[in-house]
Amino acid sequence: MSVRPVVITIDGPSGSGKGTVAGLLAKRLGWNLLDSGALYRLLAFAARNHGVDLTNEEALKVLAAHLDVQFVTSTDLHPQQIILEGEDVTDAIRNEQVGAGASQVASLPAVREALLQRQHAFLEPPGLVADGRDMGTVVFPDAPLKVFLTARAEERARRRYQQLKESGVDANLSSLLGEISKRDERDSQRAVAPLKAAPDAIQLDSTELTIEQVVERIMSEIAARDLAG
């Protein structure tokens, strides 16, 4: 009888650092990585490329079921590359327009259902680190370790501003804060899989912590629960 691989979930709002933390954890553990938020960004990005309206639930469902996507673990500073239809779109899907589109398509029940099975397929040996907004509540509710990572909205906006500036993209801090606040409200109030911590999740506020400090805290939990084998 085969033993089911372990999955660790990391949920949280936009800009909390969950994607970077998940990528570094997966690299440290030698496990698979699922960036579920990227799946919704990829869908919004692909929809625009293929001329699919973001309100056309049926067409988006079909597109979601056939997304040709790969997550490739790379360097410490950039824990993963995201490949869509053979093209590296890691940076292309990280702008605010694609993020808004991702939040829009994520509110559609048929889209979430189409992507649910795709997310389950990432759970393969030796283990999986899955980050998103409903990993611990909907996608992997039986995960033995669930983390809900957050930070104050002002700090999340500052991080995003710094990230954009380092990438050579013009950004406005107050506009970013407004966009993050709107997205928080939209994600937490949507009818399907709203953003919330699982009852048994460990809640970490990363406002005053470095990425490495967050990773070490989670690694301590993994060791305490003997999840890494």
Swiss-Prot record:
GO terms for molecular function: ATP binding; CMP kinase activity; dCMP kinase activity. GO terms for cellular component: cytosol. Pfam families: Cytidylate_kin. ATP binds at residues 12-20. It comes from the Bacteria. Its EC number is 2.7.4.25. The keyword Kinase applies. GO terms for biological process: nucleobase-containing small molecule interconversion; pyrimidine nucleotide metabolic process. It is an enzyme of class 2 (transferase). Belongs to the cytidylate kinase family. Type 1 subfamily. This is Cytidylate kinase. The lineage of its organism: Bacteria, Pseudomonadati, Pseudomonadota, Gammaproteobacteria, Pseudomonadales.
